[in-house]
Regions:
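Active-site neighborhoods and metal-handling regions in enzymes and metal-associated proteins
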Residues: 1-211
């Protein structure tokens, strides 16, 4: 969010996305509901947007929030505005709902698994002594992004990535890729992560370089 809060307000009658002016109408284009864009010229315009949706004078008796996404500061501000409302943590309930996928979501995840395989296949082609982690990772990422664009030509493309570590760099599960050159006998860690419309799939494998 780059320091600017984003939110989704759901009432019994409507769903509204709240997004920062820096992203203009992109959040509206990629959502199925209404959108309020706020500027940050004045402090707490995000909160004013929430008030404009649910009202301050006759607020709901209870307000559900995701505590695992809410900072202490934002939680205090919300409670100071809606003093007569009871706040309930619904993060686990929503997580359970997110685990139930539609057929369209399942199709995206299956395509993600297929594309992750293609990325790994491309990486294996480029593994050789003297090649760098960075260049190998770029090859895998580019293959996946092109396949995502082929499969979903009207999507937006962002956050598809590859972790590829070698030798001592494999000691941590989330180590960044480096410009280290592969050496014969290296242990290799291959991770491909295609991101399709916010859904990411992971393929992770351990390999060894024996020239």
């Amino acid at each position: 969010s780059f320091g600017r809060p984003y939110g989704c307000v759901i009432t019994s009658k409507k769903i509204i996305i709240i997004s920062a002016n820096i992203d203009a109408s992109q959040p509206w284009r990629r959502s199925h509901c209404d959108n309020i864009i706020y500027t940050d010229w004045k402090r707490d315009n995000f909160l004013k947007s929430i008030v404009s949706i649910i009202g301050r004078d006759t607020p709901p008796k209870s307000i559900g929030v995701e505590n695992d996404h809410l900072t202490i500061e934002m939680n205090n501000k919300l409670q100071s505005i809606f003093i007569s409302s009871i706040f309930k943590d619904i993060s686990l309930n929503l997580m359970n709902l997110r685990m139930i996928k539609s057929q369209e979501e399942i199709e995206i995840i299956k395509n993600g698994a297929r594309i992750a395989d293609l990325g790994a296949e491309e990486i294996v082609k480029h593994i050789k002594e003297g090649q760098t982690e960075l260049e190998i990772a770029i090859a895998g990422r580019d293959r996946m992004e092109r396949e995502i664009a082929k499969t979903y030509p009207n999507a937006e493309y962002m956050d598809t990535w590859v972790w590829f570590q070698s030798g001592i760099n494999t000691d941590g599960a989330h180590n960044p890729k480096t410009n280290r050159k592969l050496i014969n006998g290296d242990i290799l860690s291959l991770n491909t992560f295609p991101m399709i419309s916010g859904y990411y799939t992971a393929l992770e494998r351990t390999l060894f370089l024996n020239s």
